[in-house]
């Protein structure tokens, strides 16, 4: 027989809250603190000037032209968000079977990165090394006549894009 007498039911019916009693102890044992400095803001960029286009499947999110991208980036920097992830909307006429637009130095993604780094050198700019935005077929690789990804050719294309 135990020398202790419980006035409450044992665990799990009663769970003590002692670690949550004081604000300082709640901070010490909390799992996660999320601040703007922990965020990466996704941005969808399209060709043109002074353009904003709603993305129907993503309420409140827009595709923006580079000039509008810079306006939004200024606000993000002010808010303390340290990085953006860019997703280009490649015009259909720039897409090809071999995804050459992926490494075009004057391509939309490349111009957007340069503009952001010129105006906001402290802002982290993340891009996706992927070919699907640049291929006419939408595959994330260079395909053969049967629709299979040709790995060696795709790898070389991804290397060109990354550099």
State where each predicted segment sits:
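Short clusters of hydrophobic/aromatic residues that line enzyme substrate/ligand-binding pockets
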Residues: 28-29, 58
């Amino acid at each position: 027989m135990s020398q202790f007498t419980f006035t409450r039911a044992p665990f799990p019916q009663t769970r003590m809250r002692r670690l949550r009693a004081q604000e300082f102890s709640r901070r010490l044992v909390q799992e996660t603190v999320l601040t703007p400095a922990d965020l990466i803001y996704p941005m969808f960029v399209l060709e043109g000037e002074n353009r904003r286009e709603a993305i129907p499947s993503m309420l409140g999110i827009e595709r923006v032209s580079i000039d509008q991208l810079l306006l939004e980036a200024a606000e993000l920097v002010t808010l303390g968000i340290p990085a953006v992830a860019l997703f280009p909307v490649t015009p259909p006429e720039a897409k090809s079977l071999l995804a050459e637009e992926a490494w075009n130095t004057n391509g939309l993604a490349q111009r957007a990165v340069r503009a952001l780094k010129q105006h906001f050198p402290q802002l982290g700019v993340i891009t996706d090394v992927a070919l699907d935005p640049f291929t006419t077929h939408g595959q994330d690789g260079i395909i053969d006549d049967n629709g299979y990804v040709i790995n060696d050719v795709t790898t070389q294309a991804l290397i060109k894009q990354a550099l």
